[in-house]
């Protein structure tokens, strides 16, 4: 009887620890998503030259104290960028040997509009619609990565609606703090509605395995779009999972 009792206690402890580990990993994802998208300084480089190294899926640049390596699974696109002057925009994370890594974020340098275009946005907040046009989500590039627009959008949503919690603007308090992000939201997506191509979307609250190397991988294809031929449809809401 004692043996059975001790076995039961051991199983209970193991299950409890697994639950705690999962919860902790979830917390890591929440914190990392908030920090990397809204507090981390993003990469914004103009006219930097790729080192033209023989690694098919990587671009590499010198940025002073660190090398910056951009990885992509779009080998055809990357091959066109080898040795060229590029503009780089995106979120980096720490890699081995003091290098900074990121996914995609590359466009050819020198292809600019006469003036920056504010990206038109349809925004639904808990089902209520409004339109947005702001300098904070704009670009002067003729061809821009989806990553650049998505990063700027998320930072704007954090500042105005506190989607990831703990913003420093004081805005968004009216939506409460009921989600695990300590905000009023846990569900949402951004749809890139292209004029002449198939639309695509990103989930705004996707945390992957909790680490940036995982949740930033959505930009691995270095998706590039014509900046004058799309708008955004954005939805944010709260979904009770109970």
Predicted regions and their residues:
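Sec-dependent N-terminal signal peptides of Gram-positive bacterial secreted proteins and lipoproteins
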Residues: 1-26
């Amino acid at each position: 009887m004692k043996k059975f009792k001790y076995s039961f206690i051991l199983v209970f402890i193991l299950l409890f620890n697994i639950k705690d580990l999962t919860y902790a990993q979830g917390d890591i994802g929440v914190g990392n998503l908030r920090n990397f998208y809204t507090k981390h300084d993003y990469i914004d480089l103009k006219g930097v030259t790729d080192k033209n190294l023989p690694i098919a899926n990587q671009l590499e640049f010198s940025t002073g104290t660190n090398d910056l390596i951009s990885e992509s699974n779009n080998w055809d696109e990357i091959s066109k960028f080898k040795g060229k002057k590029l503009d780089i925009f995106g979120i980096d994370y720490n890699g081995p040997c003091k290098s900074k890594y990121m996914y995609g974020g590359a466009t050819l340098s020198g292809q600019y509009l006469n003036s920056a275009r504010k990206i038109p946005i349809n925004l639904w907040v808990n089902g209520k619609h409004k339109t947005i046009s702001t300098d904070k989500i704009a670009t002067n590039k003729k061809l821009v990565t989806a990553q650049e627009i998505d990063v700027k959008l998320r930072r704007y949503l954090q500042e105005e609606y506190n989607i990831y919690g703990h913003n420093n603007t004081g805005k968004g308090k009216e939506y409460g703090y009921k989600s695990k992000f300590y905000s009023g939201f846990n569900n949402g997506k951004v749809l890139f509605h292209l004029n002449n191509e198939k639309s695509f979307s990103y989930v705004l609250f996707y945390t992957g395995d909790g680490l940036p190397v995982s949740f930033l991988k959505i930009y691995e294809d270095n998706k590039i779009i014509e900046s004058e031929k799309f708008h955004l449809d954005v939805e944010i809401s709260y979904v009770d999972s109970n």
